[in-house]
Amino acid sequence: MRPEGSLTYRVPERLRQGFCGVGRAAQALVCASAKEGTAFRMEAVQEGAAGVESEQAALGEEAVLLLDDIMAEVEVVAEEEGLVERREEAQRAQQAVPGPGPMTPESAPEELLAVQVELEPVNAQARKAFSRQREKMERRRKPHLDRRGAVIQSVPGFWANVIANHPQMSALITDEDEDMLSYMVSLEVGEEKHPVHLCKIMLFFRSNPYFQNKVITKEYLVNITEYRASHSTPIEWYPDYEVEAYRRRHHNSSLNFFNWFSDHNFAGSNKIAEILCKDLWRNPLQYYKRMKPPEEGTETSGDSQLLS
């Protein structure tokens, strides 16, 4: 019998078997490596060892992910059992005490307060579980996002292409904006949930004739209805372009990419921030158009056909 009030931590059978499977595979791999080492020359053993280490590292990464799953589900099981026990105790206490009489307008506020007090720990538990799950998924997404970023940097003008071909952004971009964007090598979007929901947009540039900044950061506070400007990196225009930047900013008072880029508090700029955070960052490839390679025996023209 387990002590009263203690919790049983059950590891789900699916995860336990998967974790054991990883352990058996790693053990078999090491044993096989040892046997092969007696049959080959030292050079072959050294080459094989590198492969074994690589396989063991891969198995180790899988084991870590499985362990994350196990710990997450163990915590959920423990929390669920604790919640069940608390509910049972509350039910026993309610059965021992005579039930309340008919609800009246005078007694309703007290009853609502009692219910709210019971609800608070449940809400706190839900927030913790959601936060752990979000952090876990962010860890899993990161290597894929890093790999995607490395591939994108090998494609010249990728982000200029993507932004210019977005159905809403295309109407807000001029030819000069497009040229400025051609120097952009990377885009990163990050989100923070605590203490406030914050969306951070980082635009990375190589050397260009417009400004000195290598990174432009724009931050927005996010709520249910809107993105609200919070902070932006001041743009360090080159002296040769500063007058033109001032002219462009004051010549056109309508919403466009340049006004968003140069003036963080420009009216309506939250629309562009929302497009970048919620659409372009999540799947830029859907807006990228590739140049169609010229067919053999044909001359390449300036207006090469685009492929979706």
Swiss-Prot record:
InterPro entries: NAP-like_sf, NAP_family. Specifically expressed in testicular tissues. Isoform 1 and isoform 2 are expressed in spermatogonia and spermatocytes. Found in early testicular carcinoma in situ, spermatogonial cells in testicular tissues of 46,X,Y female and in prostate cancer cell lines. It is found in: Cytoplasm; Nucleus. Its main location: cytoplasm. GO terms for biological process: cell differentiation; gonadal mesoderm development; nucleosome assembly; sex differentiation; spermatogenesis. GO terms for cellular component: chromatin; cytoplasm; nucleus. The keyword Nucleus applies. It is linked to TSPY is located in the gonadoblastoma critical region and is preferentially expressed in tumor germ cells of gonadoblastoma specimens. Expression also correlates with testicular seminoma and tumorigenesis of the prostate gland. This is Testis-specific Y-encoded protein 1. The lineage of its organism: Eukaryota, Metazoa, Chordata, Craniata, Vertebrata. The gene is TSPY1.
